[in-house]
Amino acid sequence: MPTTPERIRHVLARVQVLLLEKNAAYGDSALEPVRIFSKADPVEQLRVRIDDKLSRVVRGGSQADDVLIDLVGYLVLLLVAQERAEQAS
């Protein structure tokens, strides 16, 4: 039976793989959005995506595990976006 630290490493590895695969497929679209419709900055756009994921968790409509992994991924991206914003100012 895996230990708690092993489980944490496993979950974080899944999040890392997901983020790197999406970054390879879509580029930095979460951190550098095209802004065709919304003019919100990347931090605000990520907060909107996180709200959407939290709504799905509350409703339980999607595969719960996938939604939670996506949510953790968006939270990581939010931290990256906030760090970028702080460095730019």
Question: For the regions a protein language model found, what residue spans apply to each?
Answer:
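Intrinsically disordered, low-complexity regulatory regions
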Residues: M1-S89
